Amino acid sequence: MCVGVTLLAVLGALSRAYSGDPNEPLLLLSIPALVYFVRGQLYARQRVNGVRITAHQFPEAHRMVVEAARAFGMPRVPEAYVVLGNGVINAFASGHGSRRYVALNSDLFEVGGRLSDPDALRFFIGHEVGHIAAGHTSFWRQFGISVANVIPGVGSTLGRAQEYTADNHAYAFHPEGVQGMRVLAAGKYLYPEVDFDDIVDRARTDTGFFVTLVNLLSSHPVNTFRFAALADRGRPGRVL
C-alpha cells in the first residue's frame, strides 16, 4: 500500500508539472531528500546521546535483540540503544542507509531491569525488531508514510496496520510477554495491578463515533482494540 501511495504521489506531481503548476510537484518531489535528512539526523542522535546495547553493556537485552533477529530470519542483527525517556514510555525502530536500529526509552527499558519483568522487555524488543523484519523501517516505506500523512486518516491507518504487524511478530517471538503491554495503559509502576482482560472486554463495550474517530486519527491502535487483537489470535486487529 505504501508503494501504491508513493507511485500515486509521484504521478500526481508529474501530472501537475505537465499542467503548468511547477511549484507543488517540486515541493512533493523534495520529500525524499527531507526523509533522508530526518532519518540521518535521528540515527545520529541515538548514536551520540544513547547508550549502545552490546554483549558487554546490558548483555541480557542484547541477547534478546540477537534472538529476535534470528527468529525472524534477519541477515543482520540491528543496533539497539537505550535513550533517556524523562518519564515517557516509548520505543521505536528506524534506519539510515543500510543500517537498522531500535531505540528504547529508559523508562520502558527499566521494566525488564529494575522492575524485573524480562518477559515484558523481550516482548517490546520483539515488537521493535519486528518492525525492521517487516520492512517498516525502509527508506521508501517511510517516504510513502510521509506522503500518505498529507491525506487525513490515510497515513495514520497505515501506521496502525504496521503496529498490528509488529505486535504479531512480538507475540510469535515471546507470547509470554504480552501482559507487559499493560505498561502502555498505566505506566511502569501501576501496570502489574491492571487487569488485561478488562481492557480486552472494553473493546466490545466502549464503542461509538468518537471512539472510531480517535482510533482513525491515531498512529497506533487504541489500547482496547490492540489488547483485544493480542487476546484473540484468530482475528486481525481492528484498523478502522
Where are these regions (language model features)?
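Short pre-active-site segment immediately N-terminal to the catalytic Zn-binding motif
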Residues: D107-F123
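Catalytic zinc-binding patch centered on the HExxH motif and its immediate surroundings
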Residues: V83-Y101
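Short helix/loop segments within enzyme catalytic domains
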Residues: H56-R63, E67-V77, P152-T205, D232-R235
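Hydrophobic or amphipathic, alpha-helical segments that drive membrane association/targeting
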Residues: M1-V88, P152, L240
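Divalent metal-coordination and catalytic microenvironments
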Residues: V65, L104, H127, A166, ...
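Catalytic Zn2+-binding segment of zinc metalloproteases
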Residues: E128-I145, P175
